Regions:
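Bacterial N-terminal signal peptides that target proteins for export
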Residues: 2-17
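Core hydrophobic alpha-helical transmembrane segments of single-pass membrane proteins
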Residues: 19-21
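C-terminal motif of bacterial Sec signal peptides marking the signal peptidase cleavage site
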Residues: 23-26
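N-terminal secretory targeting signals
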Residues: 28-32
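Flexible, surface-exposed loop/gating regions in the mature catalytic domains
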Residues: 33-283
């Protein structure tokens, strides 16, 4: 959870210099050639703070693992939460080791997709008219990484209530990011609560034309229960794959690389050297 919300909006001194250096590295990586993408929709749901074994104790989550793709050897890249969200969306933790809000350079997946004219939206449960930084709990700005880049809330970040109409309409965004609130992501509530939420949201996605026409849904957990191993569950839900299991070593950078390849854009930061999760994707 973000500490102090907007108390440390500015990144100062040596930290700012370090971030600028990291931004330069991330930007240079973004020019790497991308795999030719199929015109499919990509969905990402990020849950919270449970190990793979804990997540699989929930019946609906376990049923997805039995039916679709499972990354058995997938690890988050840091503790606490925020650096993992940044890794998933920019290919870097930016050297951060806390859950506070920081203004980072606009070198992220959202900016990348906007510049490439690829449609995208990030659906945040609990987001209100008070915006990305000031919406009340159970919304958490620390679980909304797109608000960090450039220090502002992009127009693409919207309340989760807009997902249903977008899925049922003719123009579902090519990239869909979904953040549950702090109860439904199991940060503050039992795994069973998050499992029920997933049943509803995954059902809505897999019933949509966007998913049925070749869409791919990734479900991951930002970090485990603070162990050094940081082993988390990541599922790949797509038609035509059946149950698949991969023992390859994957991380959040692998997931970002896979998403960028599917959307036809270059890889950012450490995603540039990551192994994509192609063995769990439909051919």
């Amino acid at each position: 959870m973000v500490v102090g919300r907007v108390a440390d909006v500015a990144v100062k001194g040596w930290a700012a210099l370090a971030l600028m250096a990291l931004a330069a590295a991330a930007c240079s990586s973004s020019h790497s050639p991308a795999v030719t993408a199929k015109p499919r929709n990509v969905f990402v749901i990020v849950m919270e703070n449970h190990s793979a074994s804990e997540a699989l104790s929930a019946p609906f989550t376990a049923s997805l693992a039995q039916r679709y793709g499972v990354a058995q050897n997938y690890h988050a890249v840091a503790h606490p939460s925020v650096p993992n969200y940044l890794a998933l969306t920019s290919g870097s933790t930016w050297g951060l080791q806390d859950d506070s809000y920081h203004v980072l350079p606009a070198s992220d997946l959202g900016t990348q997709l906007t510049n490439a004219h690829v449609t995208w939206r990030a659906y945040m449960e609990g987001l209100t008219s008070r915006g990305c930084l000031d919406s009340p709990v159970p919304y958490d700005p620390g679980h909304d990484p797109f608000a960090y880049y450039g220090g502002q809330c992009p127009a693409n970040v919207v309340p989760l209530s807009e997902l249903g109409p977008d899925l049922n309409g003719a123009a579902t965004p090519r990239f869909v990011w979904i953040t549950p609130d702090m109860c439904h992501d199991t940060h503050n509530c039992d795994v069973a609560v998050g499992d029920s939420w997933l049943r509803q949201e995954v059902g809505q996605i897999t019933a949509s034309p966007a998913w049925k026409s070749g869409g791919v849904l990734f479900i991951t957990w930002d970090e485990d229960d603070s162990s050094s191993d940081n082993h988390v569950l990541t599922l790949v839900v797509a038609q035509g794959t059946g149950h698949r299991s991969s023992s390859k070593p994957y991380t959040h950078y692998s997931l970002l690389a896979t998403v960028e390849d599917l959307l036809g854009v270059g890889r950012l930061g450490q995603a540039s050297g990551a192994t994509p999760m192609s063995d769990l994707l439909p051919s």
